[in-house]
Amino acid sequence: MTSQKKAPIIIGVTGGSGSGKTTVSQAIAQKFANHSVMLLPQDAYYKHQDGSFEERQETNYDHPDAFDTDLLIEQATMLKNHQPIEQPVYDYKIHNRTDEVVHVEPQDVIILEGILVLADARLRDLMDIKVYVDTDDDIRLLRRMSRDMESRGRSFDDIVMQYLKTVKPMFHEFIEPTKRYADLIVPEGGNNRVAIDLLVTKIQSILNMND
């Protein structure tokens, strides 16, 4: 009689824009080279928009309504049940979802990363570990400026305007309050090696139980 295959581990990693979520996620993935690991970015699940480019520029991308959370929950559940998904693709330069999808197979460890992954109880219930990356506001702003200017083709003035208009207020209204749901709060992001090691130890213990 064969034993039932264990469900993949889902780790939720959240924090404000520029907090170091991706760095933490990559640090986790590097520690588990002997296991299959995948990143499931919440950004891929921004809703499709029919408006003009100018209208899409004005969208509040830090509000929960900007995301197709139902689709994210559906596909995260499928991965948890060992089913492949067709993940949407989001293009930051056009501020919209593309017509493309990416075929994704379930892996041993699924890192679900995004600014609002802890905001919905249905999504939290799928997670084995919930992590909040806590970084100073000024540092996050500087990181966001560097990233958006270099890789997303945005201007300095545009970044500052968006930060003051939506990013900062939405962080305090929606993102920071989800800290209370975290199993682990990681100050200083990926630079906090002690927190990363503690997280890796916990993940490894769950994997060992699943073997």
Swiss-Prot record:
The broad enzyme category this protein falls into is: transferase
Listed A to Z, the keywords are: ATP-binding, Cytoplasm, Kinase, Nucleotide-binding, Transferase
UniProt-listed Pfam families: PRK
Please give the GO cellular component terms listed in this UniProt entry. cytoplasm
Binding-site list for ATP: G15, G16, S17, G18, S19, G20, K21, T22
Q: Which reaction does it catalyse?
A: uridine + ATP = UMP + ADP + H(+); cytidine + ATP = CMP + ADP + H(+)
Which InterPro entries is this protein grouped with? P-loop_NTPase (IPR027417), PRK/URK (IPR006083), Uridine_kinase (IPR026008), Uridine_kinase-like (IPR000764)
Task: Please list which residues make up the signal peptide.
Answer: none
Q: Which GO terms describe its molecular function?
A: ATP binding; cytidine kinase activity; uridine kinase activity
Pathway info: Pyrimidine metabolism; CTP biosynthesis via salvage pathway; CTP from cytidine: step 1/3; Pyrimidine metabolism; UMP biosynthesis via salvage pathway; UMP from uridine: step 1/1
Please state the protein's primary subcellular location. cytoplasm
Q: Which GO terms describe its biological process?
A: CTP salvage; UMP salvage
Question: Where in the cell is the protein located?
Answer: Cytoplasm
What are its E.C. numbers? 2.7.1.48
Q: PANTHER family, alphabetically? A: URIDINE KINASE (PTHR10285)
The entry assigns this protein to a family as follows: Belongs to the uridine kinase family.
What name does the UniProt record give this protein? Uridine kinase
Native source organism of the sequence: Latilactobacillus sakei subsp. sakei (strain 23K)
